[in-house]
Amino acid sequence: MSEYRIRVTTVDQKVGIFQVPRTKTVLELKELIAVTFEAPADRLKLIHAGRVLRNETPLEEILHDATDLVTFHLVIAVFNSTSTTLPSATSSSVPQSRTSELSSTNSIPTPRITSLNPEELSRRERAQRLLQTYNSFHGSGLGGLFPNIHRELESHGFSLPTHEQSSPVAESLDNSVSSALSPHLETLRRRNLSIHHQHIQAHEMAQESLETRNPGNISSSSAPLASDQSPTVSSNHIHASGNLALGSNSGLNPRSPNSFSSPLDNPALHTVDSTNVNGSLSPLSNSSSINQVHQNETHGSTISVPNPNLSQMGPSHSSSVPSNLSPNPAQNENPSTTSIPSINNQPFPSGLSASNSNFASSSFIPQSVPQLLPIYYQTIFYNGNYYLQQLPSASPPTMFRDHSFAPLVSPSIVSPYGVLENEETGECAFLFSPNASQPHFQPRAPTFGIPRNVRSLFTLPFFHTIRNIERHFRLFIRLALFCVLTTYNVSLSQTILLTSIMSVVFLLQTGALAPFINDNPLIQSGMRHIRNLQDEYRRRRNRTAQRVVEIPNETQTEDEQDGTNTPDNRADAEERELTRSQRIYRTVVRTIVAFALSFVPRA
C-alpha cells in the first residue's frame, strides 16, 4: 500500500480524512490539510502519540508500515512564532491622554492558548502576555500589584514602553507599600477583597525577595530575657491544652513565634489539682534551674531557655479541701495519710512521662526525677461530698528503650462510699469521716488470701446450692425421708430405684441439668405432661363438695326417680359398699401418688 490513511481531528471536533503518500513529510502534510482547515501551514501543529511532529520528519519514520486509519491531532496557533511582532510595544510616541493608553492596550488581540503543551509557547509570546497583563492593570490604577513585572520582561528580552517608564506609577513599582496608599487602590480594595489579598501576597513576595538579596541588612527583633533567666508567661503563651510555653527569641524563626510550645499535654509539668475530678492538671510555677541551649544555624547565636525545675514543684489545693491533705509529707500534720501500706519495693516512680517537645533531646532528660506525689490517695470535694481519688503515681511507670516513659493513667474516682480497694494487691483505703472537720484516712493492711475471682469460681456453686436448699426446704425434707426408706429397705432393686429418683430430683432442683433439659424438646414435653397431672390432682383435691338437690318431676322414669344412673349416686353407692379397711387402703394409695408427683418441679 503506497499511501497512508490519516484522520486529522481538532479541538472543536472538526475531522478530516486524507490519503497521503508514504514519501511525504510533515510539512507537506500540513500544506495538504491547510486548505481544509482554512489556516496557513506555519500555524498548524500536528500531534501524534503524545509528541509534536517536526516539519522535516518523514511520515515513514512515524507510521512505519501502518495500514489502518491513523489519527493525528491538529492544533491551530493564534500567532505565528516566526513572524510575530509586538504591536504598539515599540511605539516611540508618548500618549497624551488616558483614552489613547487604553486604545493602545486594546489594540493587542487577546491571546488564546490552543497548544496542549505550554512549553511550546515561545519566550516572545509569554512576554507579550505579561506586557498585556501589566497594561490592563496599569490602565485601571492597579499597576502596583505587580512590582516585579519589569524584571520578568527583561528576562525575556523586552523592556517597558517609553510612556510607561516615564509615568509616576512605573517609577514606584519597587515600592508596593507606597502604591497601597493611593486612594483609588484603597477604594478598590474595600470593594473587592480578592484584590486586597493579591496586594498582600505581592507585598510578601517583595519582602521575601529583599530578604533573599540582602540577608545581612534585615534586623530581627529579639525579646530580651530576664536577668534571672526565668520564662515570661503571658496570656499569649498559655495554650488551651494547659502546657507552659517557654520564652523564645523571635529572631530565630520569624514564622514560628513560639518554638517550644507543644499541643500535647505533658503530665510532668503539672501537679494534680485536688478539686478536679477528671484529673486535669494545673500549670506549673515559673521557677526553673535547667537551661536548654538552642543554636541558631543562620546567625550562630546561642540562647539559653530555662527548663522547669521539677524539684520545686508545689501542690495546689482548693479552699474547700482541708490543708492537712497536702501530698507533701512535711506539710502533713496527720500521720495516717502517709502510713498507707504498700507491698511494692519501689512505691514511687523514678521517672515520668517525657514524650513532649519541651524535652526535645534525650540528653536533657534527668536520670532520676524527684518524687512529685509522695502519697497514694487524696480526698477531693465534688458536688458537696468528699471522695477518694487514686493518684497517678501509685504504680511505677514503664520505661522504654528510648528512655521515655509510658503516659500516666488518669486518676480514678471511687463511689461516694469512700472506699478504694486494689483487687490485685488487696490494699484498701477508707474515708473514715467524710466531713469537713475530720477528713482523714484509716488504712488497712493488705490481705494475701485467695484472689477474689478464684474464690468466686469455687464457692459460687455451693452458695447456689445453699440458696436452693433454703428455697425448697420442704422438698429436701422429703428427700431425707427417701434416704431413710432406702437405708432400711431389704430389697436391693427398690433401694437402687429410690436412690436414682432422689439423685435425679436433687440435680433438677440444683439446676445442674438445666442446660440439658431446656434444650431437649422430648424432656420438655414429658415435663409438661407431669405438670398437667399435678395441676389436675390439685384441682380435684381443692374442689368443694357438691350438693345434689333433687327436684321431683312427675314425668321422670323409674330409674331416674331411683337415682341409680347418676355418677355421683354410683360413686356414693360404691363408697358405701367398701369396708373400712378398703377405704383406708385407697386413701393411702392416693397419698403415695400425690407424694410422688410432688417431686416434679413446677415452672
From Swiss-Prot:
Could you confirm whether the keyword Ribosomal protein appears in this record?
Answer: no
Membrane-crossing ranges are: 496-516
- Residues annotated as region Disordered? 85-121, 159-178, 206-348, 544-578
Which residues are recorded with the post-translational modification Phosphothreonine?
A: T566
Stretches with biased composition (Polar residues): 94-117, 162-178, 246-264, 290-314, 330-348
Q: Which GO terms describe its cellular component?
A: cytosol; endoplasmic reticulum; endoplasmic reticulum membrane
Give the highest taxon in the source lineage.
Eukaryota
Q: Which GO terms describe its biological process?
A: ubiquitin-dependent protein catabolic process
GO MF terms on file? polyubiquitin modification-dependent protein binding
- Compositionally biased spans, kind Low complexity: 219-231, 280-289, 315-329
Report domain Ubiquitin-like positions.
4-79
Annotated membrane topology = Single-pass membrane protein
Among the Pfam families in the record, one is ubiquitin
Signal peptide (residue range) = none
Keywords linked to the UniProt accession? Endoplasmic reticulum, Membrane, Phosphoprotein, Transmembrane, Transmembrane helix
Q: Where in the cell is it found?
A: Endoplasmic reticulum membrane
Q: Where is the composition biased (Basic and acidic residues)?
A: 569-578
User: By what name is this protein known?
Assistant: Uncharacterized ubiquitin-like protein C1E8.02
Taxonomic source organism: Schizosaccharomyces pombe (strain 972 / ATCC 24843) (Fission yeast)
